Regions:
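Short beta-strand-to-turn element immediately C-terminal to the catalytic PLP-Schiff-base lysine
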Residues: 42-44, 159-160, 178-180
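CN hydrolase (nitrilase-like) catalytic-core segments centered on the catalytic cysteine
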Residues: 2-24, 93-176
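Active-site catalytic loop in hydrolytic enzyme cores
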Residues: 9, 13, 31-104, 117-125, ...
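Generic structural signal for secondary-structure transition and capping sites
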Residues: 19-20, 58, 136, 193, ...
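Short, basic/aromatic-enriched C-terminal tail that caps enzymatic domains
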Residues: 177-200
Length: 200
């Protein structure tokens, strides 16, 4: 297992080499105890560390809550005109987390996951639901391959603020790119102002 500094240096070098933003999921030791932290870490195209989000909902059915320290706050980062909020795997099942980010101005969610094939229909449905109810872009990034317990079928995708799937990937490792229309978020929120009815 790589030490945090090694993982961060690796990700920083990728962002510099390809001149891209990098948002990646990593597991790192917790400085205060024997547990670990599940993080989404963000680097800009110059390789600079921008920040990290710590998973707020460890996956209790598999005992993550016994070995991973629970995050205490949401995070939103300004990236290329968007307010990006990272989400980690099981977090996707908790709509209140998304709403907390919406209150902070989020309009783009990136969900990094190890979502097994046996529940892939949940993955599809929840990604679309989070996009629709928050009138935001949702990018779902899921692993492929297998481990001793599960097969993983990928199915990474991008859902726009209206709930339309604008990009879908299959069950193998792939790299793809597309453009997101920042104006679509504002246009749809103005046309159908659901978020104005959120109650405190």
């Amino acid at each position: 297992k790589a030490e945090p500094d090694q993982s961060y240096a690796f990700l920083s070098n990728i962002s510099i080499s390809h001149k891209v933003w990098i948002l990646a999921g990593v597991i790192v030791p917790n400085e205060n105890n024997s547990e670990a932290k599940n993080l989404a870490v963000l680097f800009n195209p110059k390789g600079k560390w921008i920040g990290a989000y710590q998973k707020m909902y460890p996956f209790t059915p598999m005992g993550e809550d016994q070995v991973h320290t629970r995050g205490k706050s949401t995070k939103t980062f300004h990236v290329e005109g968007f307010q990006l909020s990272p989400i980690l795997c099981y977090d996707l099942r908790f709509p209140e987390l998304f709403r907390m980010n919406i209150v902070q101005g989020a309009n783009l969610f990136v969900v990094i996951a190890s979502w097994p094939k046996v529940r892939i229909n949940h993955w599809h449905t929840l990604l679309q639901a989070r996009a629709i109810e928050n009138q935001a872009y949702v990018i779902g990034l899921n692993r492929t391959g297998k481990d001793p317990n599960h097969n993983y079928s990928g199915s990474s995708r991008i859902i726009d603020p209206t709930g339309k799937t604008v990009m879908e990937m299959k069950g193998k490792e792939e790299v793809a790119s597309t453009k997101l229309d920042r104006n679509l978020v504002d246009e749809w929120r103005d046309k159908f102002p659901v978020l104005k009815d959120i109650r405190e």
